Amino acid sequence: MNKELLNNINKILTTTMGIDRIKKNLNINTDVVEFCKNKILDKNCNIYKQGKNYYCEIDNIIITINSYSFTIITAHIKK
């Protein structure tokens, strides 16, 4: 689990394009940022950093977050 991401959970955001992309990829119609935050905070979420991004894996979903800006880049269902 990555403490830096969890300590900055309130800084997590996304762009308008990110919202559309994530809603489409995950087939959801809810607040994307809150949905992702809830997944990240789940005790079963596997959080790891690779390069400049955090990856959060839970419930067959992968959420990609920029480690500098805490912007959700994308989220998709594992293939």
Describe the residue ranges of each PLM region.
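Ribonuclease/tRNase effector modules and their secretory precursors
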Residues: 1-79
